[in-house]
């Protein structure tokens, strides 16, 4: 009888330990979903799920709030909900502005706000963020961010019909990246060439468009 009792007790202990380990594994697995790395991977394909996970991450405090707002902005931008994308980008930007602990992230959000404001045709706001961002980019020695912001100024100028000024800024953005060895910056440079060509064609300046990049 004692052996039977010991066997039952050992079996119960085994079940208890097994269940605890299983629960721990599930907790780790669930928590791994509430990370910026995981959400960054899935938000384009699963935007609604990404937003739900971001809500969970905010309540669990697994991701800093400024990063949560940044990711929400990216999700909404991917869904073509530009006003919401701008709203959350600005929330992230304001948190960075107050803390001043991560100027690189502040610069990222400044670039995003300048781009989103262009999409909303809010040229005054876009120019303000772009000009502020250029100063910060120069301080951080970030040519990629600086060139993006120069190009955004050019787009604002073009949309406001200051065409020659626009092309000057396009050229400044391109010149800044010429000779780069960074793959990301080379891709950006190709994008700028393509966009400048599109603007020239739109202005019926086909000869100049053909000369772009030569």
Residue ranges, per PLM feature:
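A "functional boundary" signal
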Residues: 23-214
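Bacterial N-terminal signal peptides
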Residues: 10-20
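Bacterial N-terminal signal peptides that target proteins for export
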Residues: 1-10
């Amino acid at each position: 009888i004692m052996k039977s009792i010991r066997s039952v007790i050992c079996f119960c202990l085994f079940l208890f330990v097994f269940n605890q380990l299983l629960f721990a594994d599930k907790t780790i697995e669930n928590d791994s979903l509430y990370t910026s790395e995981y959400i960054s991977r899935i938000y384009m394909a699963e935007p609604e799920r990404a937003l739900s996970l971001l809500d969970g991450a905010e309540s669990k405090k697994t991701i800093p709030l400024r990063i949560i707002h940044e990711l929400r902005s990216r999700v909404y931008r991917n869904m073509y909900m530009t006003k919401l994308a701008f709203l959350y980008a600005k929330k992230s930007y304001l948190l960075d502005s107050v803390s001043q602990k991560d100027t690189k992230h502040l610069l990222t959000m400044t670039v995003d706000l300048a781009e989103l404001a262009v999409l909303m045709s809010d040229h005054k706001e876009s120019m303000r963020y772009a000009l502020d961002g250029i100063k910060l980019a120069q301080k951080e020695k970030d040519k990629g961010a600086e060139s993006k912001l120069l190009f955004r100024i050019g787009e604002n100028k073009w949309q406001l019909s200051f065409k020659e000024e626009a092309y000057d800024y396009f050229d400044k953005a391109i010149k800044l990246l010429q000779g780069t060895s960074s793959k990301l910056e080379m891709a950006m440079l190709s994008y700028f060439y393509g966009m400048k060509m599109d603007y020239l064609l739109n202005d019926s300046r086909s000869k100049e468009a053909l000369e772009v990049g030569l």
